[in-house]
């Protein structure tokens, strides 16, 4: 799926892994419903909650560019206890 760019590994996202929450950067046009269906189908897990937010915009450097470039969206996905995404397993 091209809309899911990559998993995020920051201090906050690593801390959230302990609470069974996974963080992904996704395309700015992707909505929660499509993401939930994709995660449940691809990883065979049960999603119980999703939070999303847009990353802060970066200012332009002048020139012919007007406004700000569209950046990606970040989604935090909470899974049912006992489920996990294999990308982050320690095996």
From Swiss-Prot:
Keyword field: Chloroplast, Plastid, Ribonucleoprotein, Ribosomal protein, RNA-binding, rRNA-binding
Any one annotated GO CC term: ribonucleoprotein complex
Transmembrane segments: none
Cellular location(s): Plastid, Chloroplast
Keyword 4Fe-4S listed: no
Pfam family name, one: Ribosomal_L23
Gene Ontology molecular function, alphabetical: rRNA binding; structural constituent of ribosome
SUPFAM superfamilies, A to Z: Ribosomal proteins S24e, L23 and L15e
Primary residence: plastid
GO biological process: translation
PANTHER family: 60S RIBOSOMAL PROTEIN L23A
Protein function: Binds to 23S rRNA.
Family: Belongs to the universal ribosomal protein uL23 family.
Quaternary state and interactors: Part of the 50S ribosomal subunit.
Protein's name according to its UniProt entry: Large ribosomal subunit protein uL23c
Species in which this protein is naturally found: Picea abies (Norway spruce)
């Amino acid at each position: 799926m091209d809309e899911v760019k990559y998993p995020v590994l920051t201090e906050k996202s690593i801390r959230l892994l302990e609470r069974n929450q996974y963080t992904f950067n996704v395309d700015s046009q992707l909505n929660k419903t499509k993401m939930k269906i994709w995660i449940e189908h691809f990883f065979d897990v049960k999603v119980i909650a999703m939070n999303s937010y847009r990353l802060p915009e970066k200012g332009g450097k002048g020139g012919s560019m007007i406004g700000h470039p569209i950046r990606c969206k970040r989604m935090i996905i909470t899974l049912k206890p006992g489920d996990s995404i294999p990308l982050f397993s320690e095996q």
